[in-house]
């Protein structure tokens, strides 16, 4: 699960893991062409800087990066809270609103398609109500994962699925409400 970024080494490890998920170096040419990868690369770079400064109580820098983060959230139609996402995150497709709310914990190397919503947003949330996502998960278009649930490692959640109960490791789920379609075979 996501750990807090405290040291410069933690920050560098998260930034390297996020950059590695793009599979190539993000260049100035990507910015000129308006490539989605360029926007997401810088969004997550700024999110990691915000997390680092919040966790180390650098007030002025944290305020600056919070403002930058909010501007980018509105521009990309993407809402993520600091300290909720593990290293190696990957979003695809700018446009449809995606969100990872503050009561969620997302593991490492997760992939989200457009319209994914993780966690709950509400005024009367129980502090013990957490949506916990394992490592190496894949979320299809417009899926919702929320409630006091745990999603295991290596899970694939299909398009338009609504997940409201625990999902074991290596599962493929889909439907409304989501049900297990298949358990992936593991190579050992």
What are these model-predicted stretches?
Residues 1-76, 187-188:
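Terminal amphipathic alpha-helical/low-complexity segments used for targeting or macromolecular assembly
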Residues 67-75, 92-94, 118-123:
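Short gly/ser/thr-rich secondary-structure transition/capping motifs
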Residues 76-77, 101:
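Short coil/turn segments at secondary-structure boundaries
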Residues 82, 86-93, 98-102, 107-108, ...:
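Left-handed beta-helix
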Residues 180, 185-188:
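Long hydrophobic alpha-helical segments typical of transmembrane helices together
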């Amino acid at each position: 699960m996501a750990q807090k970024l405290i040291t410069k080494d933690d920050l560098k490890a998260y930034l390297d893991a996020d950059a590695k998920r793009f599979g190539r170096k993000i260049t100035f040419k990507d910015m000129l062409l308006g490539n989605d990868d360029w926007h997401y690369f810088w969004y997550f770079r700024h999110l990691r800087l915000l997390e680092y400064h919040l966790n180390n109580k650098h007030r002025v820098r944290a305020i600056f990066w919070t403002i930058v983060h909010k501007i980018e959230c509105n521009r990309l139609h993407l809402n993520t809270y600091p300290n909720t996402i593990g290293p190696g995150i990957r979003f695809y497709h700018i446009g449809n609103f995606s969100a990872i709310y503050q009561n969620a914990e997302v593991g490492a190397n997760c992939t989200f398609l457009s319209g994914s919503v993780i966690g709950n947003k509400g005024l009367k949330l129980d502090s013990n109500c957490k949506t916990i996502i394992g490592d190496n998960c894949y979320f299809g278009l417009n899926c919702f994962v929320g409630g006091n649930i745990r999603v295991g490692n290596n899970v694939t959640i299909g398009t338009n699925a609504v997940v409201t109960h625990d999902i074991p490791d290596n599962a493929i789920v889909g439907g409304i409400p989501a049900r297990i379609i298949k358990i992936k075979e593991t190579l050992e």
